[in-house]
Amino acid sequence: MRRSTPAATPVAEASGTGGGSVRIHYRRPPDRLQLLEQAVVEDDGRCIVTWLPSAQLTKPVMAGGRVVLEPGAPVVWFTWRGDVWHDVGRFHLADGTFTGFYANVLTPVVMDGAEWETTDLFLDVWMGTDGEVAILDRDEFDAALDAGWIDAPTAARALAEAERLAADACAGTWPPAHVREWTLERAREAVG
């Protein structure tokens, strides 16, 4: 698996502004590939904020027995350069109601200009607006490991990442302030 490095080609000049779009090659073992296109709303040289105006889902995303993302709902995504093993989404309902923060544990994103590539490692971390923190999809992760879709070192790194994010959320240090500051309204204003 290729990894992102700090020398990877930036999506936009790191000026604090965005512009343009990215196409994400999002792999999920064993053989699923999704191509996702999102508008870049900010690129500060370390974190790229992207906007997905309408989540293309076949069913709602659930956490803690509640719907946290509906088909057609907007999402503000945060993806970091370098050796970062997760991204973060600010999740909403279709009417724009904020529901919480969702981290996908994944391989570091390889960024080649506006083309990105990453592999989902099954685990997710959820922090709802009520402060609930949970590691999600452990059953899918265990099944993928048993099937040989993820090797043992990658699985260990993924589990450590999920546990660290959950612990940081419980301690009040995750998500970072930059993520908390990017509200749905701010993202909508940034894309015009």
Language-model features: locations:
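Charge-rich, low-complexity N-terminal segments
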Residues: 1-73
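A generic local secondary-structure boundary/capping motif
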Residues: 11-12, 37-39, 111-114, 123-124
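Cysteine/selenocysteine-centered motifs that mediate thiol-based redox chemistry or coordinate metal-sulfur cofactors
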Residues: 160-192
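Short, well-ordered strand-loop elements centered on a beta-strand within folded domains, enriched
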Residues: 48-51, 97-104, 132-139
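Short acidic-glycine loop/turn motifs at beta-strand connectors
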Residues: 43-46, 94-95, 128-130
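A short, polar/proline- and glycine-enriched secondary-structure boundary/capping micro-motif
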Residues: 59-64, 113, 144-148
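Phosphate/ribose-recognition catalytic cores of enzymes acting on nucleotide-derived substrates
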Residues: 67-110, 116, 120-123
